[in-house]
């Protein structure tokens, strides 16, 4: 009997074409695309526009999405939500610290997540995102003439679990069946690399409105692998606007706070000026009572520090992939912000080649997502494409002494499942706390805590006798599940990791930098902690053994010798010399070897008491 195995959501009927789309849910703009007659194309609205501004306006009697909402932003800033993607998965405190100029009235929900006060009441970022997805879904179904079987939605490679889960929740709220979340740079590489059949190393430079991602990829014989990723989940073209807006404000001599409407007008002016500078050397500006002019050279100097940050992330990603810039065959430019000429020339200078821009950088991600959706829904059963994403930071578990045991190293391809066995530290231990951590450092205190859960019901045994299997599983969407199981009984506990808010600005980059900066100190701290844990085990074991069998098996002098070694080890354990502790452990072992042998003999005699030779 044969069992047909297919990707979830794939068609079991080989020649039945199903309707599936790829959605680029962007910070500034969103798009939807589909494969039609063998070609992936973005789908336009009734007016022929393929780009939908990621803007939602809440009026008392209706909700507007897209261009109409965008045009209302200056007049109704508090009810018009722009760049909601930047708020996804973040706490209210984080948002207020990061974006103090936002004109919205925020409050905190019961679970600590932000909500925005609008004319229709409170809304959260997930609900706002779902309105954008609903609009794209309606457009797709009107254009394609039928119900959608599924969608592939793209997210920045640096979105963490909370941000990815929030995106999925928004899609569910919009009534969509999510086939997969796909990293934006990966989608772009599908659109470029696989269509042209090229092989080699490719750098995907993705600078959108609110996020930056760099991915180093390898295409080889149909296998598409992400070698390394990097970036910043809070850096994009919006920051160009904010820098320019601040310059205009300073030039205009404005020192007082602006109203919500004035803030929106200023940002709109900055955006229009930025776009105009892509085609002109000088642009005239007027704001309130001030008029002036800005040159492209001055604008370039304002945004240069931001571009430099992206190039530093490129350098780190290349180092992670063990690739030099000379080995990069092509550089793919993605995201509307790469239209800025200074961005293109800066990236070209860094990699020593002219970047690829033949596919519209605004549309390339949606096109790649559409190709992937067409495969996952079952329209291309013979496709040989293999997609391998990676996790950006190592995932590990806390062990005795505050140490991190890495279970899935960073840049491991996903989906992935890895397991490791652990044991109990104390006699009779019936429970275990599992602490899931993220990061590259050796000590828990230097990493990022993701979750904690407990495993109960471990049978009472001697220390080290129980076998607990801990499994980490990261699915194709980058969501982490952790399971702990005691092997003899099968008792288990499970958790899906969903942090309450996302990584702070540059936190991923800083965590990687710190792991290199403090590598020597971390290894020394780990060596010390390991010896301290081993010393604790030896001390506890000897104390229990002496209490149980010392009087029966040892003379007073022998007991005194072992006690002296224990006391010496206790003193050494309180110090910071790992080698001295290791030497103390060896001396304690030597002092107790004869005692251990006598205990073993006594155990064997007790086990054989009353049995005949034949029975043995």
UniProtKB/Swiss-Prot annotation:
- Pfam family name, one: HSP70
Q: Which GO terms describe its molecular function?
A: ATP binding; ATP hydrolysis activity; ATP-dependent protein folding chaperone; unfolded protein binding
Gene Ontology process terms (BP) = iron-sulfur cluster assembly
PROSITE patterns in UniProt: HSP70_1, HSP70_2
InterPro entries according to UniProt: ATPase_NBD (IPR043129), Heat_shock_70_CS (IPR018181), HscA_NBD (IPR042039), HSP70_C_sf (IPR029048), HSP70_peptide-bd_sf (IPR029047), Hsp_70_fam (IPR013126), ISC_FeS_clus_asmbl_HscA (IPR010236)
Q: Does the keyword Chaperone apply?
A: yes
Taxonomically, the superkingdom here is Bacteria
Coiled coil (residue ranges): none
- Keyword annotations: ATP-binding, Chaperone, Nucleotide-binding
Q: What does this protein do?
A: Chaperone involved in the maturation of iron-sulfur cluster-containing proteins. Has a low intrinsic ATPase activity which is markedly stimulated by HscB.
User: Which family does the similarity line name?
Assistant: Belongs to the heat shock protein 70 family.
NCBIfam families registered for this protein in UniProt: HscA, PRK05183.1
List the protein's name: Chaperone protein HscA homolog
What is the protein's species of origin?
Answer: Aliivibrio fischeri (strain MJ11)
């Amino acid at each position: 009997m044969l069992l047909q195995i297919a990707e979830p959501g794939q068609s079991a009927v080989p020649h039945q074409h199903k309707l599936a789309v790829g959605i680029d849910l962007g910070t500034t703009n969103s798009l939807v695309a589909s494969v039609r007659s063998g070609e992936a194309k973005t789908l336009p609205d009734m007016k022929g526009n393929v780009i939908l501004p990621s803007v939602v306006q809440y009026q008392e009697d209706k909700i507007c999405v897209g261009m109409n909402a965008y045009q209302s932003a200056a007049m109704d800033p508090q009810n018009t939500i722009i760049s909601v993607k930047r708020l996804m998965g973040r706490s209210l405190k984080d948002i207020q610290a990061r974006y103090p100029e936002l004109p919205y009235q925020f409050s905190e929900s019961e679970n600590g997540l932000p909500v925005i006060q609008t004319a229709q009441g409170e809304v959260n970022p997930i609900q706002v995102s779902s309105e954008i997805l609903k609009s794209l879904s309606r457009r797709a179904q009107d254009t394609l003439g039928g119900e959608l079987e599924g969608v592939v939605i793209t997210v920045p490679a640096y979105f963490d679990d909370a941000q990815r889960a929030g995106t999925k929740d928004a899609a569910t709220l919009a009534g969509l069946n999510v086939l997969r979340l796909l990293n934006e740079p990966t989608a772009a590489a599908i659109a470029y690399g696989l269509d042209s059949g090229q092989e080699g190393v490719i750098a995907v430079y993705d600078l959108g409105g609110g996020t930056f991602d760099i991915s180093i990829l390898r295409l080889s014989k149909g296998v598409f692998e992400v070698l390394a990723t990097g970036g910043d989940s809070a850096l994009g073209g919006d920051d160009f606007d904010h820098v320019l807006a601040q310059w205009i404000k300073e030039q205009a001599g404005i020192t007082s706070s602006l109203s919500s409407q004035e803030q929106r007008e200023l940002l709109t002016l900055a955006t229009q000026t930025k776009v105009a500078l892509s085609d002109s050397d000088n642009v005239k500006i007027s704001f309130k009572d001030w008029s002036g002019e800005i040159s492209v050279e001055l604008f370039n100097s304002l945004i240069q520090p931001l571009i430099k940050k992206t190039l530093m992330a490129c350098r780190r990603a290349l180092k992670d992939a063990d690739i030099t810039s000379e080995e990069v065959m092509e550089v793919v430019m993605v995201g509307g912000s790469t239209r800025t000429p200074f961005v293109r020339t800066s990236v070209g200078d860094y990699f020593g080649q002219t970047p690829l821009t033949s596919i519209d950088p605004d549309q390339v991600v949606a096109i790649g997502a559409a190709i992937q959706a067409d495969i996952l829904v079952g329209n291309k059963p013979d496709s040989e494409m293999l997609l391998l994403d990676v996790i950006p930071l190592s995932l590990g578990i806390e062990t005795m002494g505050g140490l991190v045991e890495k279970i899935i190293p960073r840049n491991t391809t996903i989906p992935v499942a890895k397991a490791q066995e652990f044991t109990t530290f104390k006699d009779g231990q019936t429970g275990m706390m599992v602490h899931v951590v993220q990061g590259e450092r050796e000590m828990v205190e230097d990493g990022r805590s993701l979750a904690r859960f407990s495993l109960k019901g471990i049978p009472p045994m001697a220390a080290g006798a129980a076998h607990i299997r801990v499994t980490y599983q990261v699915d194709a969407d980058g969501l982490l599940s952790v399971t702990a199981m005691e092997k003899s009984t099968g008792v288990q506990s499970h958790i899906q990791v969903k942090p309450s808010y996302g990584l702070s600005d540059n936190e991923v980059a800083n965590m990687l930098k710190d792991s290199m900066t403090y590598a020597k100190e971390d290894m020394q701290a780990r060596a010390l902690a390991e010896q301290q844990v081993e010393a604790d085990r030896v001390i506890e074991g000897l104390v229990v053994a002496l209490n149980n069998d010392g009087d029966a098996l040892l003379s007073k002098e022998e007991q005194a010798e072992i006690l002296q070694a224990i006391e010496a080890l206790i003193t050494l354990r309180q110090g910071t010399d790992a080698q001295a502790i290791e030497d103390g452990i060896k001396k304690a072992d030597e002092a107790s070897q004869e005692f251990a042998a006598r205990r073993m003999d006594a155990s064997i005699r007790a086990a054989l008491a009353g049995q005949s030779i034949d029975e043995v």
